């Protein structure tokens, strides 16, 4: 079958297969699930950040005619479920027992006939609190007089969680000591929130007769969740089925197991009916996994000519009231140690101290690639601070320091082995597309007239695709993912995956991977995902890992099928397997191309009666579990133009050019979409997104009126392009793209804003750069938002 | 109380509390789950439906108020198996990823094109500025609407043109 | 109007996470008279439901919980109009934001309305939200209150057997408080037309659709090159209904740019902004001055017929 430009068989731009249901409003999201007799749950949450629970009176709520049950922490204690393990080997309260430790913490669970009555019943629960002083500032969490938040933990006498270091401190100190220039800068990556348009929720249906629990859930990792429920709830794992139906955006928000899910499960067991729990937006913003909140002290050392020699950083990581971040066990600060960036440096060191505060738990979310957002922000801002100090153009400074292609695979000073890269080419391409020289000339002219125009450059290298099982596990589950390919007798196929799309287009791109390997058209390949009963085990989708891990598994499974097809074809054509050659879609006899068999014909024969060699089984199915040998390292060069109103300090993003390199490109249309989404995240974080708190720990970012997300009017028409530097260790050379733009755009925009404010001598301004905060910087009073 | 609402040219009567919001009426009472909800403060716009041809946020409208008006939801865009050009446009130009904001975006696009068949990029961005998308970055949504503007459905034949 | 919504503080102080209003009884008004009758019958626990964008969000957050809602959606034709009559523009209280935005009459004679509507909420909200609903909610950051104050609008309030007209100073009692009493409703807004009147509105917001960080409306009437009347009103910065000192600085003088700047300084000095997530008090005061100056400049230019 011929491949065409509109309908590629394999890689190329093709429209998405999943669109058909979404454009008709026939997506099946968790809140769309309706089961007979289904009840609705709602959570009563703490109004205060830190308090002892004196009493909980649920009697009035139980009197409500539509209420079926009210569950409290005390009830869960009886089931040993009041606390659950987190993905970081800490514990988290499902429903509070002794204390509440953040505003919005779960205190009671009401189950009622419908969502309206469930919420009415919340007002009938009377809780008496004894307020305690709250720890809100992470910098003060380790003060001697700071109240101890986790007094539930044995041997916990302060708010310290962990210390973690990477790199060589002695070597780094030495480099800094002899450097011509050292620039130091405090910077904050403020607390933000992934805020997908669909909030989190679950429908739990415990079948008392079969003993099987079916859980529809907004989860990016259904299999991992299943295992967690087996461990936590003591339910046998084969009696748990987790279904991620369509998910309305994940962005890392839907990786953790939330108390609401556990309550829904308990609720179904207790009432004998299906129980739906869907959080509303304030709950999502106030209690589910936030992102970032890294207080950083960075330093960069260089020669006078602008050769960067060392980078160092100390971080206070605010993890909230429970350490519930998701990242591989050995890396409590995720992959932050990729802060070494895209540069050839002599030494680097980082120390990260994790602390508890009276705020919602989390930290790893919002497309951070396990803290790569924080790392890239740090290094790209430091490079610009250095450029400012030395008076060197920031693009020029980067060109003097970027790693060269012949240096790859490159082992950076904190141990990462970057797989491949041709950085200069990508940066120059971005500069050419945006017309960098021309922009600098325009800027000079505008500055002369008092206008504030800024040009920001950012270059990033990510570390994604976790990961090798030797190094990377979450809760002891190795981060390997599988793929199962079945090719039916009529030559159509089904691919079952362990990863979980939330909009990334897996139903299309993974079919394209199989199509590329086997020549079966993508429309003949059904991609199945999200149901733990029918898909292979894996750790799910986040950290841009689907293409690097499951994409590899898929390609390898397809190749196994192709190898099997060769044997079947050799039986069909009565030649030796070595006499066969492959062209996409068929094996044919070398030197006699007319004589061949299409993959469809081979499929039928494989299931048929043809005699196969000894040891060769029938059918054309194949499966793989992929253990990546390394992470992959997508990279990119971003350049942004902003204009700042000198009187109101309002920032407008005028242009944004993004040149991404994600290795082999499966579907350019989908890649572009992923990049556009991430660039918008950058506008959000750089200009307006902030989960703020007052000094009592009241959350000030608990609605979309306060937590501002960009609209179409804040975003320019994105300009994107690409380079291709395949990953040498990946079966199809692909690196992943999902989080690149979220990683690379915030520092690029901040760099542009600081550049615009050069006439005011501004060295740094923390995000979000709201008009008021930019104005403060112009007055010489820049300060972190919290 | 009894509430009768006309949705996609069909009347539905249900007995509901006065406080029932139109979005829940559509989703929970009628099973029309194409209309979504995503916030508590009328900001996100995933609940947008058309009322008398104009976009409204169904989370901020009582079902009772909707009585007496003509409501169109995403389920009403496709007619007799023929997709609306906006639906086609969103598929052609990758105007959706997770699909959650999409019904509202398409309906607003439909209303815009009905008033202004050839909108500029700026006018499209303005029209969707009350609705948030976390996935697409909006540029492909703008392209999708432009595609629909450039590929309007063939006008329905007049009664004289239809042959017996 | 009796049941008052408590201030929606930025501290988002809510007891319980909810998404739906508390229960209430519902009635549909068939006319203004019928609405007033119902208000009287049902008493202080009844609220009028117009566009719904001020009241329903409050009710969903359980910050307001009236026992009765009187739906006046059906009054949209009776009370939805913008017309010129007797040297005035008369706007029905149920006129939608979108109608105000698209009004040719307002764009040419009172463009302060058009300027403001461009930056009020978002296009979807503007399809339903009404001027009456906005004015009666009287949120201190609400733009149309400042617009009406700047142009010296008269509010027509009708009761069962009586109709009275008040100016903005009397109408705006304080945050979330207006002069509309029990068993009364706002029915019309009237603004005197003057060919020598120019008006404009300026606003800074963190993002489209957000409440103002600061906003300023100005209306200037000139005669023989001299200011005969000036209306200056700020939103979101704790200002008085209008900035009287600033207005007085202009009346009787030629509107030079220095004079406008001076008036802007008076306006900025007289307001009482609060620091919050939208901005520091200092920033808001600074921008109050900037925007007042900009609004005055454009109002004067329009009065002189020099700007669309």
Give the role of each language-model region:
Chain A
Residues 73-74, 234-239, 269-275, 304, ...:
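C-terminal catalytic domains of large/alpha subunits in multi-subunit enzymes
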Residues 246, 250-272, 276-278, 506-514:
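Thiamine diphosphate
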Residues 17-21, 123-132, 136, 220-222, ...:
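Extended active-site and interfacial segments that coordinate phosphate-rich ligands
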Residues 81-85, 121-124, 195, 217, ...:
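Short acidic, glycine/serine/threonine-rich loops at helix termini
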Residues 147-233, 402-492, 700-714, 719-721:
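Helix-loop-helix junctions that connect adjacent transmembrane helices in secondary transporters/permeases
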Residues 79-81, 177-192, 277-284, 325-328, ...:
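Short Pro/Gly-enriched beta-strand edge/turn motifs at strand-loop
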Residues 1-159, 182-185, 260, 467:
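Flexible, low-hydrophobicity surface segments
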Residues 12, 18-21, 85-86, 157-202, ...:
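Glycine-rich loop/linker segments at domain edges
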